[in-house]
Structures are given as structure tokens and as C-alpha cells.
Amino acid sequence: QFEKFVKWFLKTDPTWASQIDEVWLWNEYPKRWGADCGIDLVFTHKNGKTWAVQSKCISPNNDIKKSEIDSFLSESSDSKIDGRLLIASTDGIGKNAQQVINRQEKQVVCFLLEQFRQSEIEFPSSMEDLNQGKRKEKKKPRPHQIEAIEKVSEGIKTADRGQVLMACGTGKTLTSLWIK
């Protein structure tokens, strides 16, 4: 089930969807070379490169163990694979697993629970509702933030840096993202 969710996520999340041409579960992948031995999904990047994906659905309280990624690292080292993505429902990667990931010649990109939380998607409540998942509504600056943005924009025309002083909880970080 998690593999189907990951496929949906890669096709729906604005960051990933903008980089990906096509996503397949391993058993759908037209160029697969055997049974599922560690690669759960494959996608083609817009640059034409092929990526292998390992999806790990484990408790957020647990770490990914080396033994849980060994077959993925082995299978995805094939010359047909250009990139590797480890996507998991936890933020924890065990010490030995992290050491093996760090020593790989072919980079392994890790996308973990915290990145899911930061996604711009409203997640569906069940697997049956995947088709109804949608992007979160973009935040818009509030009146006090608009005022701060205008004042900072004016100030940096004559100075190379500045400072924003706003009360706690008024959205300083978000305001800073709107300053151009």
C-alpha cells in the first residue's frame, strides 16, 4: 500500500511532479529485469535519467536498519539506474544504514517523514481517497505582513541589509520568504 501512496505522492507533490516524467511501481516498469528484489518504484526524471525508489513504511519511532536497505542498494547499483531515492515514513536512519548510504558511489537521496510534513499537499484520509488529494492553498500575507514587506523592500533599496522586528507569532519567517 505504501508504494502506491509514494507513487501518488511523486506524481502530486509540486516539487517532485515538476521533475518527473513518469512513475511506475516495479511490477509495472516496462524495463524491469526481474522480480522485486528491493526496488519498489522507478521514475524517469525530466532530464531523461532513471531513478530507483525504495519506499519504507515503518513506525516514526523506529530507525531504518542497514538490513532493510541492503537489497535496494545492491539492485539499484545497476548501470540502468542513474539515481536513487529512499523515501520513508520515519526520520530515523540507523548508524550502520547511514554509513552505508554515505559510502555509496551513486548518491542516495533520502526523503523522510519531516519532508512529507513540509509538503504542499493535503493528504487524503485513506488510500481510497488518493485521487482526491490536492495541493494546500498557498498562504497569503496578512495586512501587518504586507506592511512589513513594503517597508523592508523600501529599506533595502538604500542598504545592503536590514532587520525585521515583529512580535512573536506574527509570521516573521513566512514574511521573510515574501521579501524580494
Predicted regions and their residues:
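Active-site beta-strand-loop-beta-strand hairpin of nuclease catalytic cores
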Residues: 42-53, 79
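Glycine-rich, highly charged phosphate/nucleotide-binding loops
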Residues: 36-37, 68-70
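Acidic active-site catalytic centers that drive phospho-/nucleotidyl reactions
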Residues: 40, 54, 145, 172
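Short beta-strand-loop-alpha-helix junction that forms the active-site gateway
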Residues: 47, 55-66
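Nuclease catalytic cores
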Residues: 1-7
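Helical mechanochemical/support elements of P-loop NTPase systems and associated helical scaffolds
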Residues: 2, 65-68
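Active-site metal-binding core of divalent-cation-utilizing nuclease and nuclease-like domains
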Residues: 21-47
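ATP-dependent helicase/translocase motor core
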Residues: 9, 15-18, 24, 31-32, ...
